[in-house]
Curated annotation (Swiss-Prot):
InterPro entries: Pal1 (IPR013226)
The keyword Nucleus appears for this protein: yes
Subcellular locations according to the entry: Cytoplasm; Nucleus
Ranges of biased composition (kind: Polar residues): 235-248
Organism: Schizosaccharomyces pombe (strain 972 / ATCC 24843) (Fission yeast)
Protein name according to UniProt: Uncharacterized protein C6B1.03c
GO biological process, one term: clathrin-dependent endocytosis
Family note: Belongs to the pal1 family.
Compositional bias ranges of the Low complexity kind: 215-233
Amino acid sequence: MGKNNPFVHSNANFPPLQTHNFEDIPEKGYTIFSSPRIDVFNEERPHSGINLNQYQHHEDDAELQSNNPFLNKDSGVDLLKLHSRSNSRIYEAKPKRVIKPKIAIIECNEMAENPPFWNQNKAFERKVSSKESFNMLGYDKIDKLDSSNSYLGDFGVHHDGPFDPCSKHRNLDAATSPIAAFSSQSEANSLPAFLLPNNSKGVEKSEENEDGVTDNDSSNVNSSTNESPNPTDINVCSNDDATDNTENNLKKKASFIYRLRKHLKRNSIETE
């Protein structure tokens, strides 16, 4: 049985048990029993930070504690100095930078009397940006002087040159209409008299459409656009395209003003 026992052959490959001096037992207070596998691991094993032998933790802890500058108070090493792995440089831990507030805390009364300077700068920037956006919309000096704010609200009224009184939004009410303030033959009228339709008698007798424009109004518009000027005015007009376009625009404005006058006249009659 002893020869065929597999445990006997497996134990024969291990070195014999290492004997210990039992005189050290009273100093350590316990007996040491070493296994053959632990003895094999202890032989020619490189040093590492991990202790594989649980019976040698006292010696390893003492060695690590002696090499640790943070745990050894007698080493004289400053705790603020950190060593790199290469031990080539010494890095000193600097204190963190303290960021001071730019504006100190002021009492409510002082803040009301003397507001911070940066608030004034922001208000000035907002004022400048509003002026820039105001100029970007194409407002001229006349627009800035007009403070009526009757059409565009807080952005003012945009004047369309000399034909601004012909705008539809300014002639909705006969009491405030600039066209109703002057007659068609007035010197204040910016349009020539020959461009205005003159057959107003037929317009008064005709029936009105649902849109508020009479049947004869549309015929008058077509006749006004096709109407040729007086012979005295033909010599003044040149054959240039620019003057032709200007004349066509004037005729369109004249027909539009004519319809606005009739619309205002009808509204004034209804209110009476």
